[in-house]
Amino acid sequence: MLSRLAFAALLLTAVAAGALASPARIGGVPIYLPAPHGFCDLSESNPSDKRMVTTLTGLLEKSGNKLLGMSADCQQLTDWRTGKRQLLDDYAQYQTPIGSMDKPPSETVAQTCATLRQEGNKILENQLPDIKARVESTLTKIKMNETSFLGVLAEDANACYAGLIQKIHTEAGTDKTQITAFAVTIIKNKSVFGYRFSVYRNQQTIGVVLGKLKADVSALLVANGRGPQAQAPARQSENPSNSLSSSTRK
C-alpha cells in the first residue's frame, strides 16, 4: 500500500495546499469525502483556488499520489480569498496512491503501519515513546525549510496515524512551524490517505491535530457505510454548484 514513491508523496504534501469536491472515484468506486467540521471546499470558480489546486495536483502526481479532495477552515478561506490573509494555516486533504487505484491495496492497515514504523526508525534513531517529547526533540534538530517525519502517532483497527513537522519560510515572508498528521485507511477496498495541517503553537498542538484527524477518519467511515449513521454527506461549501465536479477525477 505504501511504496517508497508514496512515502515521498507524504513528505511532499507537507509543503503544499490544494482542493476538490466529493464523491471522488477511485478505480470507478465512489468514495464520499466529508469535509471536517468548520471546513469548506475550495471552488473551481475561484481563480486563486483553481491555481492552488492545479499546482498541488501536478506536484503530487509526480510523486505517485492523486489529490482527491481538500478543504480549509471556512473563515481562513474567506479571508484568504478576499486578501485579508496571505496563507491558509488549517486545512485538510484526501489522497490516494495512483498505482493502486484500479486494484485492491497491497497491504493491510496493520502492515502499512509496520512500514511507517520502519521508516520512522530509519529517520529517528531513538524514537521517543511520548509523542510530545518526540516533537520537541525533532524541533531542536530541523532547520528552516526542512521536513522531518515524526513516525507513527497512533494505530487502531481502521487506520494508521503518523506525523510530519516542518519549519517553513513562507511566500509571505514569514516563518512558521507546521504540523501535519496523516491517516492511512482502506475504504471500499481502496487506499485513502487523510491529512490535517496546522500551525505548531505549543506541546498540545500535535495531540489536538491528531484528535481532529481521528474524528475526520470516523466521519469518512460513516459517510461510506461503515458506521451506525452511514449516509452520503452534504459538504460545507459556500456554493455547492461551484465546487469541482467529479468529472475532474479518475
Each language-model region and where it sits:
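Bacterial N-terminal signal peptides that target proteins for export
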Residues: 1-9
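Short N-terminal segments immediately surrounding and downstream of signal-peptide cleavage
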Residues: 21-38
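Primarily extracytoplasmic ectodomains and periplasmic/lumenal surface modules that are beta-strand-rich
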Residues: 37-51
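Surface-exposed amphipathic alpha-helical segments
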Residues: 190-250
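Short, surface-exposed beta-strand/loop micro-motifs that present aromatic residues
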Residues: 176-187
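Conserved polar/disulfide-associated segments of primarily extracytoplasmic proteins
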Residues: 54-172
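N-terminal signal peptide c-region/cleavage motif recognized by signal peptidases
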Residues: 14-16
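Short N-terminal edge-element motif at the start of the domain
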Residues: 22-23, 48-49, 53, 57
